[in-house]
Amino acid sequence: MVLLSKFDFSGNKAGEVELPDAFFVQEGNGLQLVKDYLVAIRANKRQWSACTRNRSEVSHSTKKPFKQKGTGNARQGCLASPQFRGGGVVFGPKPKFDQHVRINRKEKRAAIRLLLSQKIQTNRLIVADDSVFTSSLASPKTKEALRFLKSCNVECRGILFIDDLDHAQNNEGLRLSLRNLSAVRGFTYGMNINGYDLASARNVVISEKALKGLAGHLISGTKD
């Protein structure tokens, strides 16, 4: 078991959270696994639909624009040639085969678990008591949210907040308070976590319930 301290809205220690040792078990080549997962996320965001028309596909008459000789101009075959306005494109992009990258569910869970464990080992993950997300701010106050970050010694840079989906109706005060802070990278929910956001975030603030639910999900192997 690994014990992590959790903090209340005042930055005081409010107890500890237990994480099983299985959460930190590395499967195979961890760095390669994370790389493959992040490459898959970026590749699958692309549309792969860029398409241009060549000279045989554009809508133009095949009639010669002017006679072959006597004008002093270079001879031209038709207005579909690429040198004319509205002509075909030479070597333009075409839709390729489906280049979406598939990553197994087991590999995805292992990559996210490794990213979270690295944040824990480098002291860049702060566990907040559930009350911080649900009842700490009845109305949005950016100053109070910033005070919470400073009291927990969170570096105000690239912060990702993660909450449990069950708190979605009660965390509006905190979400709106964080919206105006440039140091906050995003606000997401445990089961919807994106590995790319997690990897690019410098610090993570996660609620106790979200951490327990996410740890159980990543270890047990339940379907996404």
Swiss-Prot record:
InterPro entries: Ribosomal_uL4 (IPR002136), Ribosomal_uL4-like (IPR013005), Ribosomal_uL4_dom_sf (IPR023574)
Region (Disordered): 54-74
Tagged with keyword Ribosomal protein: yes
Superkingdom, natural source: Bacteria
Keywords: Ribonucleoprotein, Ribosomal protein, RNA-binding, rRNA-binding
SUPFAM superfamilies linked: Ribosomal protein L4
GO biological process: translation
Record has Ribonucleoprotein as a keyword: yes
A GO MF term: rRNA binding
Coiled-coil parts of chain: none
Any single Gene Ontology cellular-component annotation: ribonucleoprotein complex
Family matches, as Gene3D superfamilies: 3.40.1370.10
Protein role: One of the primary rRNA binding proteins, this protein initially binds near the 5'-end of the 23S rRNA. It is important during the early stages of 50S assembly. It makes multiple contacts with different domains of the 23S rRNA in the assembled 50S subunit and ribosome.
HAMAP family named among the record's database cross-references: Ribosomal_uL4_B
Subunit: Part of the 50S ribosomal subunit.
Family listed: Belongs to the universal ribosomal protein uL4 family.
Protein name listed in UniProt: Large ribosomal subunit protein uL4
